Amino acid sequence: MVVIIQGKNVVDISFFPEDALQLHELAKQHSVTAIVDCGVAPGMSNWVLGYYNTIMKIDQFECMVGGLPKLRIKPWEYKAPFSPIDVLEEYTRPARYVENGHIITKPALSDVELIDFEYAGTLESFNTDGLRSLLFTMPDILNMKEKTLRYPGHIKLIQSLIKAGFLNHEPMQVQGQQVSPMQFTSKILFEQWKLGEAEPEFTIMKIIMKGMMHDKQVCVEYFLYDEYDEATKTSSMSRTTGYTCTAAVNLLLKNFFNEKGIFPPELVAPTPGCFEFVMDYLAKRNVHYRKTVS
């Protein structure tokens, strides 16, 4: 909010539980353009959906995404590309999705499926609360869901932690001290889940949109597989998230998008040239999304 009041344009990738769209009028009053949730997912998934929502009638949208280490070390077979407590929060936050035009809430980690992916092999997908602004900006799309990807077996371990109370927020008394199980668990897992500076890892995402285009039923898919870049010493999560953000920054600097207010990517994507600019910007940095239409 301070940035808006100061009259500064901004592109943001951070998670916060509040609804950024509530600041839309304030941003307009201060002649500010703010693009929010502009990472990989939410972020690129929103760019893709926002663009295709202008050229096809979408009935169904699904995004599956995950960041994983290439080396699978038991028991977790996981490394966190960001703070472990943020990952644990994602594992406990109720997941909202859209079914037949209605917002439905399910427990996080529900609807586990095993899915085969090119390059990554078999991964398990499960519900997480990643649709965010899409729940409210895309009312014409009747079915939408977002799922996170992990190696098979990881979620059973997390579910055991949840059942045992290790991810509870309510402090409990331990030897005269108030201790939050969630904070304690995050501290324990910090070193185990810490991604090494040059550790091989990858980011994978599959976006599926089904609907009508040119009077034909079509399925449009975008597939991302990106690995640690040895030449630049940057992780795939840094690249796929950070370059999406800097692409949007360049949109503002070049005045390709200058509307005032709060805009998640799906509301910027329909502006002529913006989606193409972002895709080209990423491709020039070797972040490639493969499109297929069937």
Place the predicted regions along the sequence by residue.
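Short Asp/Glu-rich motifs
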Residues: 22-23, 46, 72
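C-terminal catalytic/substrate-binding lobe primarily of soluble NAD(P)-dependent oxidoreductases
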Residues: 54-294
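Alpha-helix C-terminal capping segments
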Residues: 2-6, 250-253
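Rossmann-fold NAD(P)-binding glycine/threonine-rich loop
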Residues: 2-5, 13-36
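Adenosine-phosphate binding glycine-rich loop
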Residues: 30-69
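Short amphipathic alpha-helical segments and helix-helix/interface helices
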Residues: 1, 23-24, 49, 53, ...
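Conserved donor sugar-nucleotide recognition element shared by glycan-biosynthetic enzymes
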Residues: 19-20, 42-45, 241, 245
